[in-house]
UniProtKB/Swiss-Prot annotation:
GO terms for molecular function: metal ion binding; oxidoreductase activity, acting on NAD(P)H, heme protein as acceptor. Its EC number is 1.17.99.9. It is found in: Cell membrane. The chain crosses the membrane at residues 14-34, 104-124, 130-150, 161-181, 200-220, 265-285, 294-314, 317-337. Heme binds at H264, H325. GO terms for cellular component: plasma membrane. It comes from the Bacteria. Its cofactor is heme b. This is Heme A synthase. It is an enzyme of class 1 (oxidoreductase). It is a multi-pass membrane protein. HAMAP family: HemeA_synth_type2.
Length: 360
């Protein structure tokens, strides 16, 4: 009996390392996507060829053909008229690398997944969860093209709505993987008050809302205007006439650069306040040390992220600083996931042992 259990434990350990690798790949994918956006490279490839598109142009004639395709869209005519072929190659390589990494992630997920199923290393509930994650990954590829297509006919950039959808879906997949990874950890259940559980869940939800707002800021280039802090447009809270001049009023939440940047700022303040209150509650209530450490790291990460956001704004979105800001956002999300999951009932070693037997 000991040998089969040990074998299943070995399988689950391999599954955990595979999921760590996948989470790192998705984080890298988000950063490459951010660089692609910041360098205005996302519309350089005007076709979606999931299989044959994995190869870049291999001859001068193919490069010219790809460049001619780019010349046919509004972005070239209105923003990059006169661009040379060498300049086009620079933006092409960013978008091509982003798509290639997406293809690699699909393969890196599917092949080990099939192998683990063949070896009987996955219990049925874990298989279902991983199939859902794989399906979301396929959907993400389609959403990526849906986003790119929005900038090929009339616009000179992709739709901020579709950009935000693309980013949030990627981070939902990331969240599902990290959560699943945590559920495979060997740890006892962590006791926590209802209030701490609620605030940890609220923090995770607010982080996602803030990530969505951040994507809208990126899509509208709203970080390149109103580059002052703590005031915005001359005051801490702009006038309602400026915030809601578009009709219907709700369109301002997505289309008005002032409103979009303002709500991103306000959400940052709200997140920071909730994180600090969560930490104080954990300390005062003498919560489990793991919960206190998680709350502390989350508050510190949010402090760093807020500082980076302010600097990115004041310096008018330099690429490297903006990418660091995006990278720390992933760290904040990871800490929020871990803290929220920590509040749920963990699996004891005995439960994991039973899970391993069930997988057999």
């Amino acid at each position: 009996m000991t040998r089969p259990i040990a074998q299943k434990e070995s399988h689950l350990r391999a599954v955990r390392w595979w999921l760590v690798f996948m989470a790192l790949l998705i984080a890298a994918m988000v950063l490459v996507g951010g660089a692609t956006r910041l360098t205005e490279s996302g519309l350089s490839i005007v076709e979606w060829k999931p299989v044959t598109g994995s190869l870049p142009p291999l001859s001068q004639a193919e490069w010219i053909q790809a460049f001619e395709g780019y010349k046919a869209i509004p972005q070239y005519r209105e923003m990059n008229a006169g661009m040379t072929l060498d300049q086009f190659k620079t933006i092409f390589w960013w978008e091509w690398s982003h798509r290639l990494l997406g293809r690699f992630i699909g393969i890196a997920f599917l092949l080990p997944f099939l192998w683990f199923m063949w070896r009987g290393a996955l219990p049925s509930d874990l298989k279902r969860r991983l199939w859902i994650i794989f399906g979301l990954g396929g959907l993400q590829g389609a959403v990526g093209w849906w986003m790119v297509a929005s900038g090929l006919t009339e616009r000179t950039e992709v739709s901020q709505y579709r950009l935000a959808t693309h980013l949030v879906l990627a981070l939902l997949i990331f969240t599902a993987i990290v959560w699943t990874l945590r559920r495979l950890s060997d740890r006892p259940p962590t006791l926590a008050s209802i209030r701490l559980r609620v605030t940890s869940g609220v923090l995770l939800v607010l982080v996602f809302v803030q990530l969505y707002f951040g994507a809208l800021v990126a899509g509208l280039r709203a970080g390149r205007v109103f580059n002052t802090w703590p005031d915005i447009d001359g005051s801490f809270i702009p006038s309602a006439d400026r915030l809601f001049f578009e009709q219907p009023w709700w369109r301002n939440l997505f289309d008005n650069t002032l409103t979009v940047q303002f709500q991103h700022r306000m959400m940052a303040y709200a997140l920071f306040a909730v994180a600090v209150l969560h930490l104080i509650d954990a300390l005062v209530s003498r919560a489990n040390p793991a919960i206190v450490r998680g709350a502390l790291w989350l508050a510190l990460a949010m402090t760093l992220q807020a500082t980076l956001g302010i600097l990115t704004l004041l310096y008018e979105v330099p690429i490297m600083l903006a990418l660091v800001h995006q990278g720390v956002a992933i760290v904040v999300l990871t800490l929020a996931i871990v803290q929220a999951e920590r509040m749920t009932e963990g699996q004891s070693a005995r439960q994991r042992q039973e899970l391993g037997v069930a997988a057999g």
